Amino acid sequence: MTTQARPLQLGIAIAAALAGLALAGCNKPDTPPEQKVSAGTELDDAVITTKVKSALMTDNLGKGGDTSVETRKGEVMLSGFVDNQAQADREVQLAKAVDGVSSVQNKLMIKDGKSTAGAVLDDSVVTVKVKSALMTDDQTKGTEIAVTTNKGVVQLSGFVDSTDEQARATSVARNVEGVQSVVNDTSIKK
């Protein structure tokens, strides 16, 4: 009995080991790990950002001073508050015309009326407070999130690592005094 049972036990042990190895392969994350951006790509992105900002600042219709420009792997994100749809459309058109731009995300928001000097100052203070809160939070990369405020509405933009970081940034911003609402227009890094 022991001589015939041994091959059976050995076969069962081998099958169990192979099944364990097969199941171990199922424990992989759904999303591939983020590909690191090379120093050359970061430099290219910085040049693209500078060229887009320059194009926005020198255009008569666009008022690029109120527009945040973020670039990652040639993808440009425009965010902030503009006076009207024509200005937003023009800024997108200008960004698309810059050499090296592969695509443009339009996260520009239309202002709802004129702001008083006091309201602009209040918005500036809120922006600084939110930016500071994001910088000191250990779960967000505040240096990679742009913050713009108009009449207490805070817009977050830029490229973040995960949906968890997006949610955390929104939560941090909402808890800042003076924030009426938060629009999170960040995108997940590809």
Residue ranges and their predicted role:
Residues T2-K190:
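N-terminal targeting leaders
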